């Protein structure tokens, strides 16, 4: 099922990264990630990123393959953080690249036109490289203050988001970092095609309600 990256509000769920190098398919945290993926499919979340950086390659592959079986044939697209090789081997839809990943152009050349590529960006320069390097979309942030992104300094806010979206339009940009239900509409108004989040979209039991509320608030806005 194709994904329309130009149709807001796109919702991009990122897993919490609470697995460890001791996680196995038999441990609870492995199952928790898969439960979240199942909830995402049920809530028709557009994109899910498996962002579990502490897992061994073997266990990450098993997790990605299990998640891929859940999302296959649904409206939810599955991306794996950084590891384009594991994403392809596990049957995921694509990869989410970071500042330290392989260059976007190299991944596109290696894995082809149908491989979905998202890229984390923190400036207009980085977003521009992602755009012209062959990414399908960029995630820009942190837009707002968030404890998990302190290393990136003062957040650019909606002004920074607007600048990036305007400069690269119609290239899809999603807002990340401190995004809440109350700020989703502001991000869309600034030019973002949607939002990416960890905390706002968890736990699994609340995901359907949160997604419905995002869509309801968007529908009530005039853009």
Features from the language model and the residues they span:
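Flexible, gly/pro- and Lys/Arg-enriched active-site loops
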Residues: 97-105, 143-168
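Conserved N-terminal beta1-alpha1 strand-loop-helix module at the mouth
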Residues: 1-101, 109-136, 163, 169-172, ...
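Active-site flanking residues adjacent to catalytic metal/cofactor-binding acidic residues
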Residues: 51, 141, 177
């Amino acid at each position: 099922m194709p994904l329309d990256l130009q149709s807001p509000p796109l919702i991009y769920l990122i897993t919490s990264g609470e697995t460890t190098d001791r996680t196995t398919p038999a441990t609870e945290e492995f199952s928790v990630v898969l439960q979240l993926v199942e909830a995402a499919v049920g809530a028709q979340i557009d994109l899910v990123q498996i962002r579990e950086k502490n897992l061994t390659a073997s266990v990450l592959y098993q997790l990605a393959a299990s998640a891929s079986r859940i999302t296959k044939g649904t409206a939810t697209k599955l991306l794996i953080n950084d590891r384009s090789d594991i994403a392809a081997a596990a049957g995921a839809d694509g990869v989410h690249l970071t500042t330290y990943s392989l260059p976007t152009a190299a991944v596109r050349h290696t894995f082809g036109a149908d491989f979905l590529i998202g890229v984390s960006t923190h400036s207009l320069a980085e977003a521009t490289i992602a755009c012209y390097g062959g990414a399908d979309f960029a995630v820009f942030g942190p837009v707002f203050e968030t404890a998990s992104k302190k290393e990136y300094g003062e957040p650019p806010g909606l002004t920074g988001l607007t600048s990036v979206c305007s400069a690269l339009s119609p290239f899809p940009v999603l807002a990340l970092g401190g995004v809440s239900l109350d700020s989703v509409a502001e991000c869309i108004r600034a030019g973002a095609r949607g939002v990416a989040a960890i905390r706002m979209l968890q736990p699994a039991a609340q995901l359907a309600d949160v997604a419905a509320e995002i869509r309801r608030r968007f529908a009530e806005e005039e853009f």
